[in-house]
């Protein structure tokens, strides 16, 4: 059996991973490809915790000429020169949750670290002048062009992307910092910036007009994350060990990992890509869990969903032109660019004839995690009790006990305070949609039939449920509509037993008053 290496969970430094003999999925062929493409300025957008920082660190070691670190990797057979260049490496990851003055001091500290390395004792005042001085000094002292690596360039802006007041202020600070990258072009060998989102009005996009955005290029689709091929080859022994610990066959283990963490695609022709953070955590802890979602609350995303009044049921499958989602996030007219660039929806298909992309939630981890985050909007802030209730409902529904599940939900709703917008049928429809999505079942709303729309369809492994929801009426009225409009006929070929569920909600109590269940 091949050597089982320890997992580099939370370690983003290439040199440390190699020297400690930790697991490294070889991405060095991409490093060679990019550095020998003839281009000079590159930008890559990927979701958080997707390997961007490790990739930047890999470029750093490569440009520092540390050939010994790349022994046995793809680039060892490709690169012949191993020329050492001066490298300026900046990470903006620590620049979050800051006001203008704090951000300016943060940038000053990052510049001071580099100035100390290059012996600059009397720096200029403004950040852009200091960056120019750094590039000039490194160029003059070494006689070689300078490499500039900027990781998480947009980190200071993510928290204010929804703010019309703070975003322009902080964006101007960052524009000032990045502006020398154009003027210093003759002194630069390679510039690489990574981030989550695309901000058009930063100088790196509006002034540095020759930057190459590789974020949706087919040839770089697998540059971050772990492809299915890499999982089954470079991590084959890890899959076998995890399968043994979880008492599954190799095929069952691969399918479970795929269901939880696979499903990302970043180009029209993209391999299947797994979330690396969750995959490594699952293997290190021998447990499938919601690691990526638990590592950061997407508060800015939740704020944007509210701003654009996006219903939970609208987050799923849709078709879009590339310009609708691979677009700048400031001034956006929909939440789609932020959803895509942040990793909450991804490419699921591409039609070359229409040039339309199909977008959807990548996998179970994101689907369940996202709807859990939205749950407090519908059932109050007691998420612990809410999660417990939903877990018990899940067990009941698996046993086809919808009556018991409705009793459980009714009892819980009686304990929560008033929720905003709870006086419309749509509120309760979306609440039910969120709950059933968390249960990891197929669920859809406003499903068309020849005679009307079914409020909600729920499909489990064993049954198909058709829900009709009423407000301030009764369950009999809901059931009467299902039968009168013959909704079940639309689903006769589903191959599953059909169960009709009529539910009535009361505006005054914000709860279920009654329900009726009939088997077709």
Question: Where does each model-flagged region fall?
Answer:
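Conserved catalytic cores of phosphodiester-cleaving nucleases, focusing on short active-site segments
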Residues: 432, 456-471, 485
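Domain-level recognition of nuclease-like catalytic cores that cleave nucleotide substrates
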Residues: 490, 496-520
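Structural motif
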Residues: 147, 463-465, 499
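Acidic-basic catalytic patches of nuclease active cores, encompassing PD-(D/E)XK
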Residues: 411-444
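Phosphate-binding site recognition
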Residues: 1-424
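Metal-dependent nuclease catalytic cores in nucleic-acid-processing enzymes
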Residues: 177-184, 337-345, 433-437, 481-501
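Mg2+/Mn2+-dependent nuclease catalytic core
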Residues: 168-172, 471-488
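Active-site metal-binding core of divalent-cation-utilizing nuclease and nuclease-like domains
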Residues: 137-142, 433-461
């Amino acid at each position: 059996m091949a050597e089982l290496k320890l997992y580099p969970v939370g370690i983003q430094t290439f040199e440390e991973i190699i020297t400690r003999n930790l697991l490294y999925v070889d991405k060095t062929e991409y490093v060679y490809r990019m550095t020998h493409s003839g281009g000079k300025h590159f930008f890559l957008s990927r979701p958080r915790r997707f390997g961007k920082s490790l990739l930047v660190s890999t470029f750093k070691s490569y440009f520092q000429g540390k050939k010994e670190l790349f022994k046995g990797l793809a680039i060892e057979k490709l690169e012949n020169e191993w020329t050492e260049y001066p490298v300026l490496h900046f990470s903006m990851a620590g620049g979050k949750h800051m006001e203008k003055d704090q951000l300016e001091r943060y940038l000053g500290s990052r510049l001071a670290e580099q100035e100390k390395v290059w012996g600059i004792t009397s720096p200029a005042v403004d950040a852009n002048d200091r960056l120019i001085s750094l590039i000039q000094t490194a160029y003059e002292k070494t006689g070689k062009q300078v490499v500039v690596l900027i990781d998480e360039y947009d980190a200071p802006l993510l928290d204010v992307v929804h703010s019309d007041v703070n975003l322009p202020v902080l964006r101007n600070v960052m524009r000032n910092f990045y502006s020398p990258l154009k003027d210093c072009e003759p002194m630069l060998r390679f510039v690489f910036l990574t981030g989550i989102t695309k901000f058009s009005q930063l100088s790196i996009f509006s002034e540095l007009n020759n930057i190459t955005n590789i974020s949706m290029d087919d040839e770089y689709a697998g540059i971050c994350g772990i492809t299915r091929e890499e999982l089954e080859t470079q991590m084959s022994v890890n899959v076998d060990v995890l399968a043994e610990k979880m008492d599954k066959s190799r095929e069952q283990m691969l399918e479970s990992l795929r269901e939880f963490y696979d499903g990302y695609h970043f180009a029209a022709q993209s391999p299947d890509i797994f979330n690396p953070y969750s995959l490594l955590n699952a293997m290190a802890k021998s447990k499938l869990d919601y690691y990526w979602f638990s590592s950061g609350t997407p508060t800015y995303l939740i704020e944007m969903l509210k701003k654009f009044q996006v219903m939970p049921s609208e987050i799923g499958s849709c078709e879009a032109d590339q310009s609708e989602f691979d677009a700048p996030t400031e001034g956006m007219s929909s939440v789609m660019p932020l959803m895509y660039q942040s990793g909450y929806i991804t490419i699921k298909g591409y039609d070359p004839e229409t040039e339309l992309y199909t977008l959807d939630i990548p996998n179970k981890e994101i689907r369940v995690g996202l709807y859990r985050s939205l749950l407090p909007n519908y059932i109050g802030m007691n998420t612990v009790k809410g999660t417990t209730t939903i877990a018990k409902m899940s067990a009941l529904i698996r046993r086809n006990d919808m009556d018991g599940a409705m009793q459980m939900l009714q009892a819980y709703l009686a304990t929560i305070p008033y929720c905003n917008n709870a006086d419309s049928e749509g509120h309760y429809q979306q609440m039910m949609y969120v709950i059933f999505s968390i249960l990891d079942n197929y669920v859809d709303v406003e499903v068309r039939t020849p005679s009307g729309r079914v409020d909600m369809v729920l499909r489990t492994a064993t049954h198909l449920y058709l829900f009709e929801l009423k407000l301030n009426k009764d369950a009999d009225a809901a059931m009467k509509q299902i039968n009168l409009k013959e909704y079940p006929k639309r689903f006769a070929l589903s191959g599953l037993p059909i169960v009709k569920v009529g539910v009535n909600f009361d505006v005054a109590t914000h709860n279920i008053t009654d329900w009726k269940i009939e088997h077709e």
